[in-house]
Amino acid sequence: MTKVILLIFIRTFYGENLFVAYVVIKKCSKKIDIQTNTDKINSNFVAYLITIKLYTMSKENIEFSDAKALGLNEEEFEKIKQLLGRTPNYTELSIYSVMWSEHASYKNSIRWIKTLPRKGGCLLTGAGEENAGLVDIGNGLACAFKIESHNHPSAVEPYQGAATGVGGINRDIFTMGARPVAQLNSLRFGNIENEHTKWLLRRVVKGIGDYGNAFGVPVLGGEVNFDESYNTNPLVNAMSVGIMDKNDMISAIAKGKGNPIYIVGSSTGKDGIHGATFASADLTEDSADDIPSIQVGDPFQEKLLLEASLELAKTDAIVGMQDMGAAGIICSTSEMSAKGESGMKIDLSLVPLRQNNMEAWEILLSESQERMLVCIKKGKEHIVEDIFAKWDLNCARIGEVIDEDKLIFSYKGEVVAEVPAESLVLGGGAPVYEREYVEPEFMEEYKHFDINSIPEEDVDLHDVATFLTGHPNIASKRWVYEQYDSMVRTVNMTTNKPSDAGMVNVKGTNTALALTTDCNSRYVKADPEKGTAIAVAEAARNIACTGAKPVAITDCMNFGSPYNPQAYWQFVMSIKGMGEACRAFDTPVTGGNVSFYNQTTIAGKTEPVDPTPVIGMLGILSDKANHVPLCFDRKGDVIYLIGESADDINCSEYLYSYHRVKKSPAPKFDLDFEVKLSKLLQVLAAKKLVKSMHDVSDGGLYITLLESAMPNNLGFDITTASEFRTDAFLFGESQGRVVVSMDEDQEDDFVDFMMKEKIPFSLLGHVTKGELRIDDESFGFIKDAKELYDNAIGKIMEK
């Protein structure tokens, strides 16, 4: 009866907004013992997103307490008053709160981001100048690519959080005029034995799969890792790659007095309001109450928007176009205006809505998905209107360009906000901070590990091999990728012959693109500068192992709070390591994303995730006939190791998970050698001196050999190097090593070439029919190892 009375009250007070009713019940249930199940919330509810706090904050007399509630500090509140020459109203305050959030302004990171190499090479745009990086790939074509995070939304509502992350990153690509051809993702979850982790994993993977499969872009690669530091704060990083004519780029700009402004795509609702602010704060025990900040995606609507946008891009009607992502209309209008050194007059009454009685600030800040803002040449209005009518999408003229630095928003005949466009944007009036940073005291503990503390004679090599083969961080991610479509658009070159990077066939040319995402957060936690340089180097190794040349990167920086000096030190050192490595490889940074506040506060204790700077790298293979797979080809082929091993088990999965030694230095790494190795691998491919190449990384040499053998159900017979500990040789993760194989009749040419190059290499052994042999001992057969490797994660998920 109490519940019925409560619902009647809510229905009367809040009208038809069922989600507000849900939130009220949820809050009241804590006091009147009504049982609600927030984990099983119907996704239809999410269409009615808005919190009580924001819904009722429409007061006239704005004070600092209101600004603080929206995430602004006192200094920023005073700066806003100074910029406007008055106290802002609530709508204006909301505008600044989202545009000056870390998610939109990069106010705590831009000072360091600017130190990265941001131009040169094959880049057609500088970093951050457009919605995504753009690289010349030859034949008059360009590749647009970018990676971004959707961590906080995925922690609270994993299905929609992951799905809209995929949708948003694809819009960044096609808003430039490029057709998306490939997706990758980098995912981090907590202990996989934990039921909450399993729930997050299921929902995130389903969200990515459902959206991407329906949208029609293949997933060609990525990574999934598990560690307890991500128990309550998963990381969901999505990367999209598109191809276009390099002369047809659409810029995110608005200029030309009187040129009309259109909003196109889906209708606007209350979902995602203050999503940018939500992404710029810590996760807490009450973060489930922020489900209203999560966006809701529709991949079928996005597919229509893609086709309409690309059709419009081929006309002469368009001035500029911008995706409506974080901060919605206000972000798109301010960024396009600032870039064009202009302003806009916008009538919010003209915005197509899917919910009644929306306030002006709600329309401005809504992050409803599948929407674009388009600036059209005056007199060409019929072109955009006809195209979007053809695709059955909204196309509403909501304003025009003005020749002054102002954004003037009106609603129902009344001006509700008037702010300078330049004052809102990154690189303009948005604040820039240089935070305090200090090396954490715990770093000293990582420096004192001694390999002799692990007696070699006590190690059962067979047991370690089995343990690592079935470990969730090493084993096949088949359970994940089988839920993704990898064949749509028929561009995937690695279906039958997997390689160290995803490969895109650029149809109509001899060119292929190589794509990868890489990061080992254990290395970064042990040494942020070195660990991030290793992430860049491993990405370059993966690209080069296919035969392609690394050309550029995009990055996704996942860290704790910038107000924590120790977490900020990790970020600063990581940027330094990335910059050094990118300069060495001549792979400029095209753009990316910084995601701070990846930490959870529970019972007053704040736990950050391990620092995770994910590197998305693009490579170009100028002749796709030179593509090299990772898999052994046939029995009798010769196996060599390029690079030097070491008595090094630092930060390895073997040391961390098998021996449970959580603190050790980052593994052996030589950046200069990595650059030489990358160039060498490209030449080996071009000269066709090898049949397979696979880099040594997580799990060490043994796992590299196993992964090379499994695709064709082959085995290996190798001899370890007597000068090193056998466990270090097989399971250590010292960097700069690659396993290659070749026909016996290629061996002499390979050896002669390597001797001339003066790059260390050594004979390991040969490919067998299926047995795994090391130092004349049998380690079993490939059939059994493959069964364990392929099904380990699936069996855990089914428990």
Task: List the predicted regions and their residue ranges.
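Glycine/proline-enriched, intrinsically flexible loops and inter-domain linkers
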Residues: M57-K799
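Short, positively charged and aromatic/hydrophobic N-terminal segments
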Residues: V4, T12, E16, A21-Y22, ...
